[in-house]
Each structure stands twice: as structure tokens, then as C-alpha cells.
A protein has these predicted regions:
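Metal-associated gating/positioning segment near the N- to mid-region
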Residues: 1-49, 54-57
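Short gly/pro/ser/thr-enriched loop/turn and capping motifs at secondary-structure boundaries
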Residues: 6-8, 61-64, 192-193
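Short, glycine/acidic-rich beta->alpha junctions
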Residues: 34-38, 62, 190-191
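Polyanionic/metal-chelating signatures
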Residues: 42, 47-183
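Catalytic core of soluble alpha/beta enzymes
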Residues: 170, 190-194
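Short internal beta-strands
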Residues: 185-189
Length: 194
């Protein structure tokens, strides 16, 4: 099972058991493997149905954090891990916004997002700030989000680009190539051919 929050949440009604979505927009330093619960009832159910390996990925924000690959037959996260922090998850903003269905207005309407360009600029600023931070010989104060980007810029980590529309995919891949990111994987792409 790829790109799943399996083992990061147990009971949806109890916020304290949900570790898949942290607060904040740029969280490349958040490691999903640390929160992985190998003894989750959901993990046991998946294993009984033949799923033996899974990529545990965080959700939410613009950069959600790093994912790891685990085997589902383990006592704890240290035993479960196959590949640590293999990449970060970048949720590319949608170029479209949707108005909700209303009894008075009728069905929802899809239109161009007014915030699309400013959201992309925010991502660009984060990448530029990360590079500037990493080029400092002794950065002070320490910034964990910027520091976590070093493996992305060096090519040791993959960027999992979450995008569904054709424009999102093209813009996201173009941006990452301009940033000289070597390892890019598109996640989703459900509306890419429309």
C-alpha cells in the first residue's frame, strides 16, 4: 500500500490517536515513521488481507513531511522499517476552486483559484530560503524545516508531488526541475487527462 496513513491513526473520533496530520504548512522535518503504530488494529487487518509492505506518509499542509516504507509484521516501528525517510510529500496547490452546492445557487461551480499564484510563490520562497539556509556555514538559529531539505537538494530523497489536475502536474514538475530536484514522483493525477 503506497502513500497511506496506515498506522498513524487509530480512532478517528479521538484526536490524540491521530498522528497523520500535523499543524503547519511546511513540515519536511516531520518523520511519519516515529508515529507509526505497528500494533494498530488496522495494520493487523491489512496484514491478514495480504498487504505486507506499506509506505507510511503524512497528510496535510503544503509539505507534509517524510514517508518511510515498513513491513506490517513487526512489534514496533524500529522492527518494521525497511526504508527510512525516503522522501518528502509536496501537496501542490489546486489551480481551481469549487463553490459548494447550495439549494439556492444550485450545483457547485469550478473556477480558477485566485490564490494559485500566491500559493506557488509561497512554495518558491520556502525552497529559496531553505537553499540560503543550507549555504550558510554556521546557521543560527537552527531551522529544522530548512535543515530537512538538504537530502532533497542533494538528491538523496525523493519529492512526492501530490497533484491531480494537468496544470498542477505540469507546474509542479516544472518548478521542481527549475529547483534542480532530481527525484520526482507524481502522486494522484486523477484528473490529468481531462
Amino acid at each position: 500500500a503506497l502513500n497511506t496513513s496506515l498506522g498513524l491513526g487509530e480512532i478517528d473520533a479521538v484526536r490524540a490517536t491521530i498522528d497523520e496530520d500535523e499543524i503547519g504548512d511546511f513540515l519536511p522535518h516531520v518523520r511519519s515513521i516515529i508515529a507509526y503504530n505497528a500494533e494498530s488494529k488496522v495494520v493487523e487487518t491489512m496484514r491478514m488481507n495480504g498487504v505486507l509492505i506499506s509506505q507510511i506518509a503524512p497528510n496535510g499542509g503544503i509539505i507534509s513531511g517524510s514517508s518511510s516504507v515498513v513491513q506490517l509484521d513487526a512489534w514496533n516501528w524500529e522492527d518494521a522499517v525497511i526504508s527510512y525517510d525516503q522522501g518528502i510529500h509536496l501537496n501542490w496547490p489546486s489551480p481551481y476552486s469549487r463553490s459548494g452546492y447550495s439549494y439556492y445557487r444550485g450545483p457547485s461551480v469550478i473556477k480558477k483559484s485566485e490564490k494559485y499564484e500566491s500559493n506557488i510563490e509561497e512554495i518558491k520562497n520556502f525552497f529559496d530560503s531553505s537553499k540560503a539556509y543550507l549555504n550558510e556555514p554556521n546557521p543560527n538559529p537552527v531551522s529544522l524545516p530548512y535543515k530537512a531539505m538538504s537530502s532533497v537538494f542533494s538528491g538523496r530523497s525523493t519529492v512526492f508531488l501530490h497533484a491531480n489536475y494537468e496544470k498542477q502536474i505540469k507546474d509542479g514538475v516544472k518548478f521542481l526541475q527549475e529547483q534542480k530536484i532530481k527525484n520526482i514522483v507524481v502522486v494522484g493525477g486523477t484528473n490529468s487527462l481531462q
